[in-house]
């Protein structure tokens, strides 16, 4: 995949942004990277049928990665993998990265992260009934999570005695709920929004950030610890936040309720050396 322009509707001045990011991106210019990740993680990454009948991976993460590639002069291929395989691939390949990852002390021993580009909400998908909007409303329910995700770790921490079932991917969790074998799928809120819209009868509740913010951080780009290109990508993300490009992408792929709207205080900083 070769980089294309930014999100539709962006009014940002791409010329000045590209010039400033290029200074930090000298080491990445001309590089060929690999973006690994789940391609069934809408609205971040998902397959869309094109006019020629072929399928193409699109979504928020792809749009942001394309724009970074355009500004910094690198290219990348997307390689679909489930969550567990993604972590191993990034750890073993100094040209690989993934996105929609939260940082924590354990992960920071092995990986470097950019600042955050997106603030997630935790969603709860159920088949019918009232939307689950509080953690206490999950009491007595069987809960599905994708193995190793922040949602998985969050619920295991706050409800250690809950009936938690883990699966390799979000699609498996969804099918368990649709089949009535599991009561609730604890997921990324925007992912849950896409799944609800595509499946009649699903109900989505969003947990308040006051209950989740200590456990579920901003989404970042993640690469192997010590990879030199992380600093350039981090600076580029900072510029894209400031010039409104990322909010344009969020509005297009997720919705206006999830935009930063000028307050980037929660985006944090990069974990890369020297940042």
Predicted segment positions?
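A ligand-binding cleft/hinge motif common to bilobed small-molecule-binding domains
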Residues: 84-88, 101-110, 154-157, 183-215
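C-terminal motif of bacterial Sec signal peptides marking the signal peptidase cleavage site
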Residues: 2-6
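Ligand-binding clefts/hinges and TM-proximal coupling segments of bilobed small-molecule sensing domains
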Residues: 9-10, 15, 153-168, 204-208, ...
């Amino acid at each position: 995949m070769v980089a294309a322009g930014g999100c539709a509707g962006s009014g940002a001045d791409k010329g000045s942004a590209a010039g400033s990011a290029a200074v930090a991106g000298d080491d990445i210019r001309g590089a060929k990277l690999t973006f690994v990740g789940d391609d069934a993680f809408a609205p971040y990454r998902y397959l869309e049928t094109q006019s020629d009948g072929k399928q193409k991976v699109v979504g928020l993460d792809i749009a942001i990665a394309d724009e970074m590639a355009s500004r910094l002069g690198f290219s990348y291929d997307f390689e679909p993998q489930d969550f567990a395989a993604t972590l191993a691939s990034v750890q073993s390949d100094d040209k690989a990265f993934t996105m929609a990852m939260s940082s924590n002390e354990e992960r920071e021993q092995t990986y470097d992260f950019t600042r955050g580009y997106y603030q997630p909400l935790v969603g709860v998908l159920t088949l019918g009934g009232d939307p689950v909007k509080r953690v206490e409303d999950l009491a007595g329910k069987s809960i599905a999570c994708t193995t190793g995700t922040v949602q998985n770790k969050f619920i295991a921490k706050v409800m250690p005695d809950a009936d938690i079932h883990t699966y390799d991917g979000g699609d498996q969790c969804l099918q368990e709920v649709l089949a009535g074998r599991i009561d609730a799928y604890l997921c990324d809120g925007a992912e849950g929004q896409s799944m609800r819209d595509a499946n009649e009868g699903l109900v989505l509740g969003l947990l308040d950030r006051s209950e989740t913010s200590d456990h579920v951080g901003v989404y970042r780009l993640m690469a192997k610890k010590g990879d030199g290109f992380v600093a350039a990508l981090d600076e580029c993300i900072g510029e894209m936040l400031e010039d409104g490009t990322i909010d344009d992408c969020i509005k297009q792929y997720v919705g206006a309720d999830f935009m930063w709207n000028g307050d980037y205080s929660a985006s944090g900083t990069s974990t890369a050396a020297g940042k």
